[in-house]
Amino acid sequence: MTTLVVVATRAEAAPVPAGLDVVVTGLGKTAAAVATTRAILERDRKGLVVVNIGSAGALREGVEGLHEVGTVLNHDISAEAIRALGYDPQEELRVGDAEVVLASGDLFVTDPAVRDELARRAHLVDMEGYAVAYACRQLDVPVRLVKHVSDNADESALDWPALVDLSARELGRWLADHAPG
């Protein structure tokens, strides 16, 4: 089995253990989907597993630390409107057995009203997880999403550049202990 580690930023990639293949996607769903797809197509897919690591905002009180995601949502798509047109928006993907739900979108969540709305459906929020999972699903490559809480998806998210290093170190330790191949 070969692991491809997918991260949004160089800061999140810095603590990845030597010897693991790493792709830095850039921020947001479009950048993540394109970079993940390109990276998968450039590699032998037999035995490949993608591990998307990164920081995330906590949407609920008491959610902290490191989490493996079981379900990921595309939170800023008009799913009901798309469904009404007769199409499946595939806004929710099951990626593992964990109960943690991650909401991904191109919004940097700092607004308490947005946070509260997302908290009804998810535990964590990020900007890339859904896109990575969707690309993997389309290319029949297994994926794991592992996130570390860096902020509370409120005004503290504006301090993200200062907080991401702690998350990156924790994720690097997790990879050293759990990443296959």
Q: Where are these predicted regions, by residue range?
A:
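Glycine-rich phosphate- or other oxyanion-binding loops that anchor nucleotides, phosphorylated ligands
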Residues: T9-G181
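Extreme N-terminal starter segment of soluble prokaryotic enzymes
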Residues: M1-L4, L48
